[in-house]
Amino acid sequence: MMKKGIHPEYIPCKVTCVTSGKQLEVLSTKSELRIDISSFCHPFYTGSDKITDITGRVEKFRQKYNMK
């Protein structure tokens, strides 16, 4: 059983995905949240084959610090 008076109050919260612009409502202690990525636009959930090119970033890093 929860103690009275020590827990925060949960209120409806509007969560906005800044990548897709979609919104959903959940319960939280905050009234509004902005997130970078959600299940609306993440490749795992959408099934898209968007691959991030991290090889280029690694090569830039190695060139910057003269590493092999």
Swiss-Prot record:
Keyword Metal-binding found: no
GO-annotated biological processes: translation
Superkingdom classification of source: Bacteria
GO molecular function, one term: rRNA binding
Keyword check for RNA-binding: yes
Family: Belongs to the bacterial ribosomal protein bL31 family. Type A subfamily.
Protein name: Large ribosomal subunit protein bL31
